C-alpha cells in the first residue's frame, strides 16, 4: 500500500542531510546517514492536506490554539499512547529544542545544573551550555539486555542543591532506550523529593517497536513538569517547523506562553505545520504503522549484516528510533581512523559516537530511515571501513 523502497532525490532541496553534509564531514560527495530525518516522502494524507491548503492561496497569520489542532493532538495521544490529555494544558512552540531552551531559562538561573542521561542528543548540551547552565551527566549503563540508569547515581546528582532540572529524553536518543513504567515512577519520585523540575522530550515517542511501549511522562508526573513533542520525526516533516507540549502548572504555562508571544514574537505558527499535524494525527496512523514495520526490518538488516561480519558485536536492534547505535568497542578500533576510512575510502557519512558525549566513544550512530537500497550501501561501507582499520 505504501512504497518505502522508492528513492527520492533530495539534492538541491536545501536539505541538511544531503546538501550540507560537507559542513560536518568536510566533503560533499558522501552518502549520508546522519541527521535524524528520513529519506521518505511524508504520508499521502499530509501531502493531500497541504495541497488543498496551498490551493486556498492566502497565507496570513495563523493561531495554534484552535479546536482542530488541539483535538488532533488529543486524538493521537488517546489512540496511539492510551493517554488522555487536557487540551487546556497544551502549548505550541516552533521546535522542541526552542521549548527546551525556554523552559531551562525559566526554571533555572545562570550556573545552575540540568541533569541529562548520557550519551545524549548533542543539541541537549548546546541548549544547556548555550543558556549558561551546567550539564550534570548521569551515564546510562549498557548491559546484556539493554540500557539502564543507576537510580542511586541519579539521586546523588538530583540531590545536589545546584540541580534544578532533569531533561529527560524519552525514548532516549541515541541509545533507543524506552523507559519502563517502574523507571519513570522512580525518576518522578526522586525529582519530586528533591524539588527538581522535569522537561521530557518525547519527539521519538511514535518510533517504538520493542515489547516495552512508550509511556508519556504525564502518566507518572508530579510537581512542575513539561512534556514536549512533535509529529516531525514520525511523519518526516521537520522542515515545516512546529512542536507542542503539555505544561500542567498554570503559572508555568502562562510564563512560557508570555515569553513565546511577548518576548520572542513566535506565537503565530506556520499554517502548513498545523495542517500537516492535523492530517497526520487524524488520518496518518496506517502509513505510520507500515513505516514502523519497514524501519524495524531495516534495523534487523543492520543487525544481521554487522553480526555476520563481526560476530563479537552481537548487536541487538534498539527498542525505539530509526537510529542504529552501534557499539564497536569489542572491535577495539580507533574512532578517528574509522571516520577517516568511512569518508575517504567508502564515501559514507555516519555520525561518530563521541558527538553525543564521552560515553559515546567507540560507537557510531547510523540513520536507518531510508530505502533499503541506500542502507545496503551504507552498511557495506561501514563493514569495509572497519575491516580497513582493524
UniProtKB/Swiss-Prot annotation:
Keywords: Amino-acid biosynthesis, Lyase, Methionine biosynthesis, Pyridoxal phosphate, Repressor, Transcription, Transcription regulation
EC numbers on record: 4.4.1.13
One GO MF term: cysteine-S-conjugate beta-lyase activity
Cofactor or coenzyme needed: pyridoxal 5'-phosphate
Pfam families per UniProt: Aminotran_1_2 (PF00155)
InterPro entries in the cross-refs: Aminotransferase_I/II_large, C-S_lyase_PatB-like, Class-II_PLP-Dep_Aminotrans, PyrdxlP-dep_Trfase, PyrdxlP-dep_Trfase_major, PyrdxlP-dep_Trfase_small
Cystine pairings recorded for this chain: none
Reactions it catalyzes: L,L-cystathionine + H2O = L-homocysteine + pyruvate + NH4(+); an S-substituted L-cysteine + H2O = a thiol + pyruvate + NH4(+)
Positions bearing N6-(pyridoxal phosphate)lysine: 233
Substitution effect: residue 233 to I: Loss of enzymatic activity; but no loss of repression function
The keyword Lyase belongs to this UniProt entry's keyword annotation: yes
BP-aspect Gene Ontology terms: methionine biosynthetic process
Entry keyword Iron-sulfur: no
Family affiliation: Belongs to the class-II pyridoxal-phosphate-dependent aminotransferase family. MalY/PatB cystathionine beta-lyase subfamily.
PANTHER family registered for this protein in UniProt: PROTEIN MALY
Subunit annotation: Homodimer. Interacts with MalT.
Function per UniProt: Acts as a beta-cystathionase and as a repressor of the maltose regulon.
Name of the protein in question: Protein MalY
Organism for this UniProt entry: Escherichia coli (strain K12)
Lineage: Bacteria, Pseudomonadati, Pseudomonadota, Gammaproteobacteria, Enterobacterales
Gene symbol of the encoding locus: malY
